[in-house]
Design a protein with these regions (language model features):
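N-terminal cap/lid segment of alpha/beta-hydrolase-fold proteins
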Residues: 42-96
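Short, surface-exposed "cap/lid" segments of acyl-processing enzymes
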Residues: 79, 84, 90-130, 134-148
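Cap/lid segment of the alpha/beta-hydrolase catalytic domain
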Residues: 110-114, 126-127, 131-181, 233-242
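Primarily recognizes the serine-hydrolase "nucleophile elbow" in alpha/beta-hydrolase
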Residues: 185-249
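The feature captures the conserved acid-bearing segment of alpha/beta-hydrolase catalytic domains
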Residues: 237-291
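Histidine-bearing beta->alpha loop at or near hydrolase active sites
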Residues: 297-309, 314-318
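Surface beta-strand/loop "capping" patches
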Residues: 312, 321-364, 389-397
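Short beta-strand elements
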Residues: 425-442
Length: 442
């Protein structure tokens, strides 16, 4: 299988003065100076502590060295960006893991669920996958900005960056650019703290952070893959035309930050989504995945929302790390074969490279299919309130199958997908196919 983005991309929703942006004669492209970003100069690094701790993995303890530090990444939107960071490194780091790093930020809220980031995205992958992992606190958007403007939400801060973009045509003032710089500087800070270079790196980001890591992959050959949650590219030229009618600067933004599926067609990438994410329309996600030809996988968590909070999503990410960093073969979950019976539907899973599959489930929900109106739309979307149910598939004659009773059901509202639990060594996680809409065969 080869596959919304911008939780608050009001720019593309066309909420503010498209006429003004249409008059701009000069557009400034995104500037990425890797030499400067990789230099420790200006980090103002503050080393806080180094300690050893253990994580239990399959009834055994894995020792990690935990570095705590603080660094300065940039001045952005009239504010100094300082970041608290945690680097977890296996004490017994295998030779095959040297030079590798999993870098995570802008995935879940540091303030609301700090444990999910440090434990689920930090300690656990370091211990289970066996690679160094860096997590750090994202942009401090609610300090000086709130004092200056009286606005307290990150959405309002992001909207302010888009206002600057409209007035200047400069891609470097958009929130995504600031997030990208912060991640690159975090990487350099981790190298300074650890004393060694990381030249094979996987990035993870959610929502606007998901867009940022996908864009970073286009500028830095050391980035071998990304995990994107709460965010997918725009699936169709039709959507881009519609958004450009609302906001004439859309093509410039799309070009600079590589937002089209075609920009990712041959990349190594994983999408880690929630079935009910307001920003990841299930049908759009399917259309994106159908356009990808590289090494790509998706996991859709049933009843999951915008942030990738579920333990199963963390486990899916660890599977991907094991696959990309160490080359372990990874099953490829395809859309199931569906056969209509009398008052029932039969489902047969289709899984390429099935080694390691431990269990398979059918996920289904009934809701009205409504076309996605575009990023940052405030329209009510039926999929956001869908109630997904899971049904185990039984393995018979080498095939995983299940039957869904449908008497009295409105099959025009049926959506479904297959997910599989996979084990690779000491890493267990989930993968899925994209959400499908049932279409009755003629």
């Amino acid at each position: 299988m080869k596959p919304i983005v911008l939780t608050s991309l009001v720019l593309l929703a066309g909420a503010l003065q498209p006429a003004q942006s249409a008059k701009l004669e000069k557009l400034t492209p995104l500037r990425v100076d890797l030499n400067a970003l990789q230099s420790p100069e200006g980090l103002q690094l503050e080393r806080k502590s180094v300690r050893e701790e253990t994580v239990e993995v399959d009834s055994r303890e894995v020792a990690l060295r935990h570095y705590v530090f603080r660094f300065f990444s940039q001045r952005f939107m009239d504010e100094d960006w300082w970041h608290d960071a945690h680097l977890f490194v296996p004490v017994e780091l295998a030779d095959s893991a040297r030079g590798k790093l999993f870098l995570v930020s802008h995935v879940v809220s540091w303030r609301k669920v700090p444990g999910v980031l440090r434990e689920g995205y930090g300690r656990q992958p370091a211990a289970r996958v066996g690679v160094p992992v860096l997590v750090f606190k994202p942009n401090p958007v609610q300090r000086e900005f709130a004092k200056r403007t009286g606005l307290n939400s990150e959405r309002e801060w992001q909207d302010a960056t888009f206002d600057r973009f409209r007035k200047t045509g400069d891609a470097n003032v958009v929130s995504f650019a600031g997030i990208m710089t912060a991640k690159w500087r975090a990487w350099t800070a981790a190298e300074a703290v650890f004393g060694k270079k990381f030249d094979k790196v996987i990035l993870a980001g959610g929502s606007k952070g998901g867009l940022a890591v996908r864009a970073m992959m286009k500028f830095d050959p050391r980035i071998i893959s990304v995990v994107s949650s709460g965010s997918i590219p725009f699936a169709s030229p039709t959507m881009l035309r519609k958004l450009t009618e609302r906001e004439p600067l859309t093509p410039h933004l799309v070009e600079q930050f590589k937002i089209k599926p075609a920009d990712l067609a041959n990349d190594t990438i994983m999408f880690n989504l929630g079935s009910n994410d307001h920003n990841a329309h299930p049908t759009e996600a399917r259309l994106v995945m159908e356009q990808l030809r590289g090494d790509a996988r998706i996991y859709v968590h049933p009843n999951g929302g915008h942030p990738a909070l579920a333990p199963q999503q963390g486990a899916a990410m660890r599977l991907w790390l094991r696959h990309v960093f160490f080359g372990d073969p990874l099953p490829d979950v395809r859309p199931p074969v569906v056969e209509a019976g009398e008052n029932s539907l039969g489902f047969r899973a289709v899984i390429k490279q099935p080694k390691g599959v431990e269990a398979v489930e059918l996920c289904h929900a009934f809701y009205r299919e409504k076309p996605w109106p575009g990023p940052a739309s405030r329209e009510r979307m039926p999929h956001k309130n869908a109630e997904w149910k899971t049904t185990p598939l039984a393995k018979r004659n080498g095939h995983y199958t299940a039957t869904l009773e449908t008497k009295g059901a409105d099959l025009g509202r049926l959506h479904y997908y297959i997910r599989a639990r996979v084990r690779l060594g000491q890493v267990t996680g989930w993968l899925s196919c994209p959400v499908q809409q049932y279409v009755k065969k003629p």
